[in-house]
Curated annotation (Swiss-Prot):
Post-translational modification: Phosphorylated.
Name listed for the protein in its UniProt record: Epstein-Barr nuclear antigen 2
One GO cellular component, as annotated: host cell nuclear matrix
Chain spans, region SMARCB1/INI1 binding: 1-176
Localization per Swiss-Prot or TrEMBL: Host nucleus matrix
Region feature Disordered, mapped onto this chain: 52-78, 148-451
Family that this chain belongs to: Belongs to the herpesviridae EBNA2 family.
Species classification: Viruses, Duplodnaviria, Heunggongvirae, Peploviricota, Herviviricetes
Length: 451
């Protein structure tokens, strides 16, 4: 008998259509009467099982009641006749107990507990640890660490009341050396070493303790070995003495080694930063997109005279250098090239070195804005005869200087500003030539004048 399983909303009306497909098998169609409310309904889905067949025979058993999917998160109902559910491990009660166990486990983990929950049978250990801290503040309790954990703890408090009698045990120092061994545990013996301990500080403590105090300072790595030797060999003869100093000596050297480790680690091989610094010293100053800078030659006497006139006017940026070169030839005579005629294809410029740039000879009688020579004359190169733009031409139609092509500028600089000259910024005197130059061409930036 074909069986169909459906999940329908409660309180809804559906059209149930049973048909036979082309193969002959029954087909079931369930269409909601209100398709829009089918999507917006908040009622829970009800599982249905539909058997398609004849009415003869025994009806099928009813399906078991559906179990809520959130049963594990619900409290077990007191009215539930089967609290453990159909399966022992999946019922509401079993799931609630499992959640409780897991919550307890998480809390124990957060508190630092590890492992399973076991009855803490050996609770005497924490009590013994509690008794020890109360005893150590007094010096006579040091030998109690060597003795077993049960009996001697009760006896040390008794000799603590005995210290006012240091005189009688004077003949017993040799006997006390044999008393501390473990085989002898009577209550009468512990007081005798405790009484002798009060006398020994005046006799024996000053001699062994000073070297032990100096050892950790002088030999920090070896000090860890010295306490071990004092604890192993003199346990029998001087049990109370080496115990107390060794405990104090083991503590200070521990922070010392870490403090001494960083200094040797610091002087390591020179880091790569040193190499980068050396490289930075050789790099030219200025923006990275400028051409390489050449060292200026030693200025001659004639250059020094002209440099005194043009000082402060060669600091302008390279955008207007070409125009200034054109204007520098107006007031003076014809240009006389340098003796060396071999010139590179693209002259090297120095935007930073402005004070060392001279005019070669006293060609500029009038100090004006045209006294800046941007070319770096490392090899006395004659750049004016390279390009035709250096030929004498009228200042009415200035052209873009070929010394600074558009390709050399970063994208942030507008090539339209190449025609401007910045040499007038450093002017301090008036010259008829400078006024004529800037009156004709409009400038975007104000020109400081003394008018």
């Amino acid at each position: 008998m074909p069986t169909f399983y459906l999940a329908l909303h409660g309180g809804q009306t559906y059209h149930l259509i049973v048909d036979t497909d082309s193969v002959g098998n029954p087909s079931l169609s369930v269409i909601p009467s209100n398709p829009y409310q089918e999507q917006l309904s908040d009622t829970p889905l009800i599982p249905l099982t539909i058997f398609v067949g004849e009415n003869t025979g025994v009806p099928p058993p009813p399906p078991p009641p559906p179990q809520r999917r959130d049963a594990w998160t619900q409290e077990p109902s007191p009215l539930d006749w089967d609290p453990l559910g159909y399966d022992v491990g999946h019922g509401p009660l079993a799931s609630a107990m499992r959640m409780l166990w897991m919550a307890n486990y998480i809390v124990r983990q957060s508190r630092g507990d590890r492992g399973l929950i076991l009855p803490q049978g050996p609770q005497t250990a924490p009590q013994a640890m509690l008794v020890q801290p109360h005893v150590p503040p007094l010096r006579p309790t040091a030998p109690t660490i060597l003795s077993p954990l049960s009996q001697p703890r009760l006896t040390p408090p008794q000799p603590l009341m005995m210290p006012p009698r240091p005189t009688p045990p004077t003949p017993l120092p040799p006997a006390t050396l044999t008393v501390p061994p473990r085989p002898t545990r009577p209550t009468t013996l512990p007081p005798t070493p405790l009484l002798t301990v009060l006398q020994r500080p005046t006799e024996l403590q000053p001699t062994p303790s000073p070297p032990r105090m100096h050892l950790p300072v002088l030999h920090v790595p070896d000090q860890s070995m010295h306490p071990l030797t004092h604890q192993s060999t003199p346990n029998d003869p001087d049990s109370p003495e080496p115990r107390s100093p060794t405990v104090f000596y083991n503590i200070p050297p521990m922070p010392l080694p870490p403090s001494q480790l960083p200094p040797p680690a610091a002087p390591a091989q020179p880091p790569p930063g040193v190499i980068n610094d050396q490289q930075l010293h050789h790099l030219p100053s200025g923006p990275p997109w400028w051409p390489p800078i050449c060292d200026p030659p030693q200025p001659s006497k004639t250059q020094g005279q002209s440099r005194g006139q043009s000082r402060g006017r060669g600091r302008g940026r390279g955008r207007g250098r070409g125009k200034s070169r054109d204007k520098q030839r107006k007031p003076g005579g014809p240009w006389r090239p340098e003796p060396n005629t071999s010139s590179p294809s693209m002259p090297e410029l120095s935007p930073v070195l402005g004070l060392h740039q001279g005019q070669g000879a006293g060609d500029s009688p009038t100090p004006g804005p045209s006294n800046a020579a941007p070319v770096c004359r490392n090899s006395h190169t004659a750049t004016p005869n390279v390009s035709p733009i250096h030929e004498p031409e009228s200042h009415n139609s200035p052209e873009a200087p070929i010394l600074f092509p558009d390709d050399w500028y970063p994208p942030s600089i507008d090539p339209a500003d190449l025609d401007e000259s910045w040499d007038y910024i450093f002017e301090t005197t008036e010259s008829p030539s400078s006024d004529e130059d800037y009156v004709e061409g409009p400038s975007k930036r104000p020109r400081p004048s003394i008018q």
